[in-house]
């Protein structure tokens, strides 16, 4: 099964830039979207179905035009779960899961820490998400968590680790959390197969030349639970897709 994760930074904006044509060409079995910034009634749902995705699930934020996640799939899931059931985690539409016979796929949009208030919210979300996943793994050991984690794990994952050492997204406490999350039973599928530097998934629009000069951050991941480790066939970053300030990431599970 080929799975793609993509923070589209506004699905309507991405559609206007050719997203649906790209989706047909990329042809994943499942695509996890983050930061959709829209509700399903605002979207051309028939176009997604005509593109080959009859099953599409949308979890927008309560606040209009903000956050939100979605999953589109060619294969009908046996179960769909919107959110975690924890109010402070769910009102911004940050977590959606589909269950298939063999494993489950989750679309995750971890909060960013743009100011002290949001950083506190981010750390609370991270702690509660870890606890949620610890319990979920007892029920669903085969789990793929795709999304925008808003964290660079290692120095190799960011273009300027020294200058960004005190910036949210690369703070020691954030990196420690991701390190512990991985050690608790997950594989960073891209790093499992690729140890090369210069592979990023997000480039700030505040610096217009950042993407052209590849001054980026790798904050989008497809994390695969340990029982699926030997079934990771491919893991790629797809920087040629330019519908967003992020690019898609891909994992293929046998």
Spell out what each predicted region is.
Residues 51-55, 127-215, 219:
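Metal-dependent phosphoesterases centered on the DNase I-like endonuclease/exonuclease/phosphatase
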Residues 74, 98-101, 225-226, 251-254:
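Active-site beta-strand termini and strand-to-loop segments that position acidic
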Residues 6-7, 23-41, 105, 133-155, ...:
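Active-site beta-strand/loop signature of hydrolases that rely on acidic residues for catalysis
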Residues 37-39, 45-113:
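Structured beta-strand-rich core segments of catalytic domains in phosphoester-bond hydrolases
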Residues 85-86, 110-126, 162-166:
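Surface-exposed cleft-lining segments at the edges of enzyme active sites
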């Amino acid at each position: 099964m080929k799975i793609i994760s993509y923070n589209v930074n506004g699905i309507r904006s991405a559609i206007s830039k050719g997203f649906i044509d790209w989706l047909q060409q990329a042809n994943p079995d499942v695509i996890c979207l983050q930061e959709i910034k829209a509700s399903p009634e605002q979207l051309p749902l028939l176009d997604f179905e005509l593109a080959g995705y009859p099953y599409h699930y949308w979890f927008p934020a309560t606040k209009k035009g903000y956050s939100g996640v979605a999953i589109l799939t060619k294969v009908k899931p046996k179960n769909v779960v919107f959110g975690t059931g924890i109010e402070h985690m769910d009102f911004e539409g940050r977590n959606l899961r589909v269950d298939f016979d063999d494993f489950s796929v989750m679309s995750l949009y971890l909060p960013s820490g743009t100011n002290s208030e949001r950083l506190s919210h981010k750390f609370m979300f991270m702690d509660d998400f870890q606890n949620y996943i610890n319990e979920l793994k007892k029920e669903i050991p085969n789990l793929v968590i795709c999304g925008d984690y808003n964290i660079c794990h290692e120095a190799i994952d960011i273009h300027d680790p020294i200058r960004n050492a005190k910036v949210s997204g690369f703070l020691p406490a954030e990196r420690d959390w991701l390190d512990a999350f991985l050690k608790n039973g997950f594989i960073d599928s891209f790093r499992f197969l690729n140890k090369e530097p210069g592979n990023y998934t997000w480039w700030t629009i505040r610096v217009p030349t950042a993407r052209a000069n590849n001054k980026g951050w790798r904050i989008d991941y497809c994390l695969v639970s340990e029982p699926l480790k030997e079934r990771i066939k491919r893991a790629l970053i797809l920087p040629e897709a330019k519908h967003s300030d992020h690019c898609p990431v891909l994992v293929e599970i046998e």
